[in-house]
Amino acid sequence: YKRVAILYPDTAYGRDLARLFAQEIRQQDGELIVSEPYKEGDSDFRAVIGKLKAEDLKKYGVEVQVDNDPAKTGIRQGGKKGKRLLYSPGFDAVFIPGRSLDVGLLAAQLAFFDIAVPLLGANGWNQPDFARVADRTVEGGVFADGFFAESSSPVVQEFVERYRKRFQATPSLFAAQGYDAARLAVEAIKRGATTGEGVRDFLMMQHDLPTLSGPSGFSPDGTLNRRVFLIQVKQGKFVPLD
C-alpha cells in the first residue's frame, strides 16, 4: 500500500502505534494521507470519518454524483430517488490500531460512507469473538500480533497444548512473553551466567535466541527484535498469513 490513512484511539497506546506506523510508511516511500484520532468507546464516528474524507478530497479522493435509486442500487440514504455524492477514496488502506469492539463499529460506518478499502490493525483485534461476530466489513482485514495461538508453528502448538492442559485456557500474549522470558533466563544460567548482569550480557551477545516467534536477538537498547505474526480475518476466522 502506497497511500494510507490512520484512524487511531486517542490513548497513549493508540498515539504511539499511529506514530510508529506513520514513520514506517514514510520510510517505505509511502504517503500518509490523513491521521485522525477518535475517542475510545464511542459508537458514532461520523465526525471522524468526515474529517478523513475532507482531508482526502484535498489530495486524491473524488466525489461524483450518481442516481440514488434504492431499487437499483440497494443503497438507502433517505430512501428517496434523486442524486447522491459517491465518494471514491484516494488511499489504499486504513490502519486502525484500536480495540476490537471499536474497530467493528468503525469498519461498518466506513463502509456506509463508501470507504471500502483494506483495513489494517494491531493486537487489539486479536479477541476470540471478533472474527466471528464482527460485521463483514472487516473481512480480509489484516493485523499484527506478537503471539498467535493458532499458528501452525510446532513450537507454538506445543506451548499452547501444554498451557491449555495446565490452565484450561488459551495462552495470551502476556503468557507467551512470560514463557519466553523464563526460558531465556534458564538458557543463560545453563550457559554459565550466575548474576543478573551475567544473564544480561549473555542475552545481548546472542542473535538466535529461541522464542515462540522464532530466532530472536536484542538490540543495543535492550529491545527484543522478534518476528510478529500477521493474521487475516477470513470467513469468520483468524488465518495466519505466514
Give a label for each model feature.
Residues 1-242:
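Extracytosolic ligand-binding ectodomains
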